[in-house]
């Protein structure tokens, strides 16, 4: 389908768990080819532009065996599912044996049906790619050992947890610069021209099956990061960076494919320059969860060209459920924040319903939990309002709240506005557990000389203000803890 909007809203689904839930409810196996219309409706509410089917690729039997033998992982599985059964453990979706839709989910044909079903609804499909490593039983391990970081018997003896002997070669297990090796994957060589060519081919094949690709731990392939991780084992870094070299051909063949980088360590800007449309905004996530209003505000002072290519989120398959981290009103304030900022927005299946258990990605089943229909209705209202009222249209500006000598609670307010040809919106959030008051000067020159009606799109309240006062001293704000205004000016 492609034709992505500038500020897409993406809904992540753990494919294995979702289809497992649907299968149990239906009393039969449900694949991606026969998901009921009502179930697609539930994950594509108004305001969603794309669905990320996380974990559709063929999982590794070798990786599954390692997971079943790992006492620490098994303990984490039982913490999530006290009634754990052997069939609940299916292996990691990021231990990929082949980039072919798993037969458990219906295979490639079922994936194609799902994509067509979504496209008929105007919804794009996002899929995963893992550039750094593959499963130990991936065909490349035996057929193309030159694509991997290689060692020798001395390495294997000195650090057996970091290396794998296979087919007469010693290959490195996957890792990043800061943690021990991952025992269930084999490390690809980002400096290898052959690997870069093979990656380009794989990405092109994935792009033919979807509208966007989310690249796992994309910063690990940056030349400086890879050199730091492997300390010269792979020779000097090439002149060209990995991603520009790999993506040049993809862009020629699939120009509209949106590329999203999972990115940490302040590598977002660099990955944007190397060809990614959007990068994870982990800094904003951390600052919101830490309830650091000043840091959130400082983050939003970054250049708009940078912010417009960030992916904002409050949870995903790697992070704890936001309902387990923030109380209800605080979660809603945070949700309004990320839903109305520039850039892309990511929501996670189960987030709207208030799920609190964060299941490991190795599992195909999650525990039953009490769901929160009121919270789900509120989230659906938020998405529908932001999309239907064209809130994120036109020019975005960060606004400043001022206070008084004896009242500086304005420091807990964050605010911004959007102005399009026919739309003006102001967002004010009290991102704290205390009441906050302040005045916010609105930036539009034609405010004075007439009255304006301000309508809160979430609260369904209206009030009238003089345009001169809105310009100076500004819109007076008085918000209870964790409350917000999402205002339309008419």
Question: Each predicted region: which residue ranges?
Answer:
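Active-site and adjacent substrate-binding regions of carbohydrate-active enzymes
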Residues: 1-490
């Amino acid at each position: 389908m492609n034709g992505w909007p500038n500020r897409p809203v993406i809904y992540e689904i753990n494919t294995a768990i979702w289809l497992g839930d649907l299968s149990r409810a239906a009393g039969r196996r449900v694949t991606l080819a026969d998901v009921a219309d009502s179930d697609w409706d539930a994950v594509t509410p108004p305001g969603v532009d794309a669905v990320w089917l996380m974990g559709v690729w063929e999982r590794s039997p070798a990786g599954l065996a390692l997971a079943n033998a790992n006492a620490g992982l098994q303990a984490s599985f039982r913490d999530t599912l006290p009634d754990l059964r052997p069939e609940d453990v299916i292996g990691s979706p990021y231990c990929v044996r082949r980039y072919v839709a798993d037969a458990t989910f219906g295979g490639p044909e079922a994936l194609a049906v799902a994509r067509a079903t979504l496209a008929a609804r105007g919804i794009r499909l996002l899929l995963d790619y893992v550039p750094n490593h593959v499963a130990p039983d991936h065909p490349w391990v035996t057929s193309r050992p030159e694509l991997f970081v290689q060692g020798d018997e001395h390495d294997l003896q000195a650090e057996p947890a970091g290396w794998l002997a296979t087919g007469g070669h010693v290959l490195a297990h996957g890792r990043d610069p800061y943690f021990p090796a991952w025992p269930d994957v084999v490390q690809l060589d980002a400096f290898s021209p052959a690997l870069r060519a093979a990656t380009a081919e794989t990405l092109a094949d994935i792009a033919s099956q979807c509208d966007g690709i989310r690249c796992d731990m994309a910063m690990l392939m940056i030349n400086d990061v890879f050199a730091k991780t492997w300390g010269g084992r792979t020779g000097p870094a090439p002149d060209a960076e990995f991603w520009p070299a790999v993506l040049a051909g993809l862009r020629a063949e699939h120009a509209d494919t949106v590329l999203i980088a999972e990115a940490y360590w302040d590598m977002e800007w660099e990955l944007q320059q190397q060809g990614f449309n959007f990068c994870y905004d982990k800094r904003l996530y951390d600052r919101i969860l830490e309830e650091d209003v000043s840091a959130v505000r400082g983050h939003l002072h970054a250049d708009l060209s940078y912010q417009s290519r960030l992916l904002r989120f409050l949870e995903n398959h790697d992070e704890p459920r936001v309902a387990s981290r923030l109380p209800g009103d605080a979660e809603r304030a945070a949700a309004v924040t990320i839903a109305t900022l520039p850039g892309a927005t990511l929501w996670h299946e189960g987030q709207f319903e208030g799920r609190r258990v964060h299941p490991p990605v190795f599992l195909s089943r999650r525990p039953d939990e009490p769901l929160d229909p009121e919270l789900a209705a509120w989230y659906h209202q938020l998405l529908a309002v932001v999309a239907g009222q064209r809130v994120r249209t036109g020019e975005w500006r960060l606004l400043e709240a001022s206070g008084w000598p004896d009242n500086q609670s304005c420091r807990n307010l964050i605010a911004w506005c959007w102005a399009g040809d026919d739309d003006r919106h102001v967002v004010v959030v009290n991102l704290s557990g205390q009441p906050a008051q302040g005045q916010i000067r609105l930036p539009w020159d034609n405010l004075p000389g007439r009255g304006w009606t301000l309508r809160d799109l979430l609260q369904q309240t209206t009030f009238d203000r003089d345009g001169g006062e809105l310009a100076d001293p500004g819109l007076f704000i008085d918000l209870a803890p964790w409350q917000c205004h999402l205002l339309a000016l008419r």
